[in-house]
Amino acid sequence: MATNLKDIADQYAKAIFELSSEQGNVEDTRKDLDTLKVVFENNPNFVTIVSSNDINSEARDGLLTTLTTGASEAIQNLVKLLAYNNRLNLLTQIVTSFEDYYNDAHGIVNVVATTAVALDETRLDKLAAVFASKTGAKHVNLTNNVDESIIGGVILQSQSTLIDGSLQTKIAKMKAQLLG
């Protein structure tokens, strides 16, 4: 049984991912969820308004129907279920967990490349290719984070892998060897 909100969100995400996989509409579900996430992020008071006791159920249902117009029946039902269980506040976490399931199923890995200076697209593409070859990922989404304190080199980090080729780490290791 789920004990924390992240676990609860993960259960919803897994259920909607499995359902959309069975129905063959994972891409549509993903787009619908991304759209909802944007709405929730751009309107932080939406959950408070919809969950308020000051709003009657007819108005609440109308807002939720308007929100999910054009979305699949599964997404419409998910939003209604979340509202019924007072869990609309979990929607953005559900979308994040859904993306994790989607990425795992498609061999997609999100990686942060930390460098001392910003890298151009050519270098980022080369780093993505190197990371993919070392980890077996089918596709790598690489973002560049600039941190001058690493001095030089690169640190590649995904959810499960860390490759530290920074000069800062190399210098620290040399220092430890010399002093140790």
Swiss-Prot record:
Species per Swiss-Prot/TrEMBL record: Leuconostoc citreum (strain KM20)
Topological relation to the membrane, as annotated: Peripheral membrane protein
InterPro entries associated with the record: ATP_synth_OSCP/delta_N_sf, ATPase_OSCP/dsu
Protein name: ATP synthase subunit delta
Superkingdom, natural source: Bacteria
Chief location bin: membrane
Sorted UniProt keywords: ATP synthesis, Cell membrane, CF(1), Hydrogen ion transport, Ion transport, Membrane, Transport
Subunit structure: F-type ATPases have 2 components, F(1) - the catalytic core - and F(0) - the membrane proton channel. F(1) has five subunits: alpha(3), beta(3), gamma(1), delta(1), epsilon(1). F(0) has three main subunits: a(1), b(2) and c(10-14). The alpha and beta chains form an alternating ring which encloses part of the gamma chain. F(1) is attached to F(0) by a central stalk formed by the gamma and epsilon chains, while a peripheral stalk is formed by the delta and b chains.
